[in-house]
């Protein structure tokens, strides 16, 4: 520590370099997540959904044999597929953020860094 409780200039410079590096890598990660397609499907594979790494819905595929299912079963399958895609997307995003920050606990909103 330098005088007056301030870190020395070298430490401060390194901290700024690290922050800039994280910022640049965060933009790359954002672009990567945006271009990802993560699939979720119902257990019977009648419904498949894809969402981006940013958790935006991309598309839905319905098996042509679904017409034999009743309304409640179809609704259950849709919800199941969405939940699985969302869970995979969330896990992927957390893993990539953890890689980006080198395990630093940044307490970013929406990302519980202690889940990993």
Swiss-Prot record:
Residues 87-116 are annotated as: Disordered. It is found in: Cytoplasm, Nucleoid. It comes from the Bacteria. One of its GO terms (cellular component) is cytosol. Residues 99-116 have a biased composition (Low complexity). It comes from Prochlorococcus marinus subsp. pastoris (strain CCMP1986 / NIES-2087 / MED4). Disulfide bonds: none annotated. Its main location: cytoplasm. Keywords: Cytoplasm, DNA-binding. Belongs to the YbaB/EbfC family. The keyword Cytoplasm applies. Residues 87-98 have a biased composition (Basic and acidic residues). NCBIfam families: DNA_YbaB_EbfC. One of its GO terms (molecular function) is DNA binding. This is Nucleoid-associated protein PMM0020. Homodimer. Pfam families: YbaB_DNA_bd. Binds to DNA and alters its conformation. May be involved in regulation of gene expression, nucleoid organization and DNA protection. InterPro entries: YbaB-like_sf, YbaB/EbfC.
């Amino acid at each position: 520590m330098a005088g007056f409780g301030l870190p020395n200039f070298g430490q401060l410079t390194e901290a700024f370099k690290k922050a800039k590096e994280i910022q640049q890598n965060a933009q790359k990660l954002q672009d990567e997540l945006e271009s990802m397609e993560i699939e979720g499907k119902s257990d019977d594979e009648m419904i498949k959904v894809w969402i981006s790494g940013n958790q935006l819905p991309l598309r839905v595929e319905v098996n042509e044999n679904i017409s034999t299912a009743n309304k409640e079963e179809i609704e259950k399958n849709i919800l199941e597929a969405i939940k699985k895609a969302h869970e995979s997307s969330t896990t992927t995003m957390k893993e990539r953020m953890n890689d980006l920050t080198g395990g630093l606990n940044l307490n970013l909103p929406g990302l519980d860094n202690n889940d990993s």
